[in-house]
């Protein structure tokens, strides 16, 4: 059972959250999509919204089979929610980055303590590649979030459980990861600890 955060722990967590938002959201809405991938991804999502065809991504009049549709669905939903492609095209990556940080913090807090959670999330936030990708309209932040969520759910079940809802959620996240990118098999690797535990 988790103990409530002390006032100093709560302040530290809020400082980390504010820093994460400041770092990841800096410049949000102030730029247009940058070549090579961002304009293409936004165009595919925009075409989904305009045509109503959400199953088969298209670029112009051509089918766009290069990537699975899940990320384009997120971009399209963000565009519908904000009404502005300039404000929406970075939203899935921003939310995925913040979600990944929260999952890392919460899992470390549950396994050890709040201090470990703060250090773990800080360690992720200072990785240049993480920040770089979270500030771009790329599929990778979404894949990282889904992979982290898959591991989070499975580890909550295996190490802190039984927690079958979290296990099912982790498996579902692994499945979404599979349809998010061409190398989507990576989230399925999250199932290896469970298979190992069952085999033992």
Give the positions of each predicted feature.
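Membrane-integral, polyisoprenol-dependent glycosyltransferases
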Residues: 2-200
């Amino acid at each position: 059972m988790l103990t409530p955060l002390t006032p100093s722990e709560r302040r530290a967590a809020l400082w980390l959250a504010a820093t994460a938002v400041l770092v990841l959201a800096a410049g949000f809405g102030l730029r247009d999509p940058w070549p090579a991938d961002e304009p293409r991804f936004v165009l595919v999502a925009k075409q989904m919204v305009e045509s109503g065809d959400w199953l088969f991504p298209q670029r112009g009049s051509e089918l766009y089979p290069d990537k699975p549709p899940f990320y384009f669905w997120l971009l399209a939903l963000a565009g519908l929610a904000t009404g502005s492609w300039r404000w929406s095209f970075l939203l899935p990556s921003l939310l995925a980055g913040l979600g990944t940080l929260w999952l890392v913090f919460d899992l470390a807090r549950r396994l050890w303590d709040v201090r470990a959670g703060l250090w773990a999330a800080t360690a992720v936030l200072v990785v240049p590649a993480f920040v770089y990708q979270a500030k771009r309209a790329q599929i990778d932040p979404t894949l990282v979030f889904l992979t982290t969520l898959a591991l989070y759910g499975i580890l909550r079940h295996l190490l802190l459980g039984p927690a079958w809802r979290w296990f099912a959620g982790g498996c579902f996240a692994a499945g979404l990861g599979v349809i998010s990118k061409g190398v989507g098999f990576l989230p399925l690797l999250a199932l290896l600890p469970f298979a190992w535990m069952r085999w033992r």
